[in-house]
Amino acid sequence: MKATLEKIAELQKAGIIERFAIGGGIAHFYYIEAGTTYDLDVMVTMNAQASTIFSLEPLYEWAKKSGYIVSEEHIIIEGIPVQFLPSFNATITEAIEQADLVEIFGVKTFIMKPEYLMVIMLDTYRAKDRERLIKFFTQSGYSTTLFEALVAKFNLVEKLKEFKAKYYGH
């Protein structure tokens, strides 16, 4: 994992990606009890060009030049399947911009704050997201104030009410 994180940092230094933050299962396990995950999800903003069409092509070109295998949506970097996900909405963009600088395996990297992960899980609402969201409410040291502000900002108040009614009876 250390070598993988170092390569991702190099992508930013080289200007291939503008900003990034670890999200998905690996980010979740930074804050809550570990479970299983297959890959490393890296949310990215790319350096803007004249086109408004978002493309991960520079990442795939880098992978090819660097001798890394591309397998479906993953680039296998130093043995770790990495899925680069574009910043496709305001929530993800803000989560990347507000990410915390942390040290993992001796490498400085960016990871999404727990409140943003929680809002993203509430928004996507897959079964594994709901399960992890319950763990976040009970295991992570998140800011209730920030979480509630983000829920309101990203129009998820009703969804949170439904979630709480279903899983907590209120």
Task: Outline where the language-model segments fall.
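Compositionally biased terminal segments of proteins
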Residues: 1-170
